[in-house]
Amino acid sequence: MNLQKFPRYPLTFGPTPIQPLKRLSAHLGGKVELYAKRDDCNSGLAFGGNKTRKLEYLIPDALAQGCDTLVSIGGIQSNQTRQVAAVAAHLGMKCVLVQENWVNYHDAVYDRVGNIQMSRMMGADVRLVPDGFDIGFRKSWEDALADVRARGGKPYAIPAGCSDHPLGGLGFVGFAEEVRAQEAELGFQFDYVVVCSVTGSTQAGMVVGFAADGRADRVIGVDASAKPAQTREQILRIAKHTADRVELGRDITSADVVLDERFGGPEYGLPNEGTLEAIRLCAKLEGVLTDPVYEGKSMHGMIEKVRLGEFPAGSKVLYAHLGGVPALNAYSFLFRDG
């Protein structure tokens, strides 16, 4: 496998820490050891997160092409668009963000706080569009790209989640290589890695990266899209493409993609009672915050899998914390009593 052939623009602090979740593990019976890899703390650029790790491989391509404007898309409280805005500001580039109405949630300040507030503060041209949720290519995004060109700019197209992009899976191939180096220092290997999945390239990159040592199917995706068939297809397609690009040396198949569909409801961006319980439990036991859209759902999935005995006793499970906490302000009513 050859990740090193791809140029990388450093936007993160370096390898992210692995933190034992001792109190949460004990609360759940102590038979499974839980750890968190803190990609939510990976950068000083507007709180960072998993997209910042991905952007390290997209930015060299944008600069090589002479692009002057980063153009991306997400929901109103998109972590992706906030991270793209931060990177654009850091590099002195322009930024156009298409923010669609992906979440069926209504709050007076939903489009004025959290991620979208930060994007505006960092100088991004934020364009609100009423279209609903979908992880595919969007006309609103293509229109924004065309508008930049019409104004004489040179846009660089960054799809939702950085995912359906030729380089979108590389960052989390690097995540797997980083974990292997940390495992050597820790003196053990993780039996499972739990990760939230929506647009797919985070899990896809992990699948490829961990396939290098036979652990592709130990990456447990927790669907948060509530459209798992589409997410599964995209994970597999991106993983296959990424495996070819990094010269993995074997094909990625559907057996390598594990996606738990039980925790994504009721729909994208809306938490269920299990999501909220997991957010509060992790916060109160560990001081680790998660969000109602992504990490709260993957945390719920991991907690329930422990409770149901789906991880064998003695397992060491690594929770990939991808970020998302800046969206909490947009859901303040749900947590008005903590």
From Swiss-Prot:
Gene3D superfamilies: 3.40.50.1100. GO terms for molecular function: 1-aminocyclopropane-1-carboxylate deaminase activity; D-cysteine desulfhydrase activity; pyridoxal phosphate binding. InterPro entries: ACCD_DCysDesulf, ACP_carboxylate_deaminase, ACP_carboxylate_deaminase_bac, TrpB-like_PALP, TrpB-like_PALP_sf. It catalyses: 1-aminocyclopropane-1-carboxylate + H2O = 2-oxobutanoate + NH4(+). Keywords: Hydrolase, Pyridoxal phosphate. It is an enzyme of class 3 (hydrolase). One of its GO terms (biological process) is 1-aminocyclopropane-1-carboxylate metabolic process. Its cofactor is pyridoxal 5'-phosphate. The modification N6-(pyridoxal phosphate)lysine is found at residue 51. Catalyzes a cyclopropane ring-opening reaction, the irreversible conversion of 1-aminocyclopropane-1-carboxylate (ACC) to ammonia and alpha-ketobutyrate. Allows growth on ACC as a nitrogen source. Homotrimer. Belongs to the ACC deaminase/D-cysteine desulfhydrase family. This is 1-aminocyclopropane-1-carboxylate deaminase. The gene is acdS.
